[in-house]
UniProtKB/Swiss-Prot annotation:
PANTHER family listed in its UniProt record: RIBOSOMAL PROTEIN S15, BACTERIAL AND ORGANELLAR, SMALL RIBOSOMAL SUBUNIT PROTEIN US15M
Protein name: Small ribosomal subunit protein uS15
Pfam families for this protein: Ribosomal_S15
Gene: rpsO
Domain of life: Bacteria
Length: 88
C-alpha cells in the first residue's frame, strides 16, 4: 500500500491541472508504483497467489487506461510511457 505522502508526490508529478487526482496519467502512475511494489513483494513471497491475482488486475487496469489514452490523445500516451519507462 502506498503511503499518503508518496501518493501525493506522484499526483504532484503527473497532474494536468491544479486539482487533478483522477486523470489517466495520474491513475497510470499510481498503478505503476503499486505494481512495482508488488513485484518486489513477490521476490520474497513466491507463493502469495492471492496478491498475485490483485497484481494481474492492476496490470489489466493500467493497460486499459493506457489504451484509452492512446485512443484519445496519442501525445499524452507517449509522454506517460516515456516518463514511466513502460513498454508499449
Amino acid at each position: 500500500m502506498l503511503a499518503r505522502e508518496h501518493k501525493t508526490n506522484i499526483i504532484e508529478q503527473y497532474k494536468t491541472h491544479a486539482n487533478d487526482t483522477g486523470s489517466p496519467e495520474v491513475q497510470i502512475a499510481i498503478l505503476s508504483t503499486r505494481i512495482t511494489e508488488l513485484t518486489d513483494h513477490f521476490k520474497a513471497h513466491k507463493k502469495d497467489h492471492a496478491s498475485r491475482r490483485g497484481l494481474l488486475m492492476m496490470v489489466s487496469k493500467r493497460r486499459s487506461l493506457l489504451d484509452y489514452l492512446k485512443k484519445y490523445d496519442t501525445e499524452r500516451y507517449k509522454s506517460v510511457i516515456q516518463k514511466l519507462g513502460i513498454r508499449k
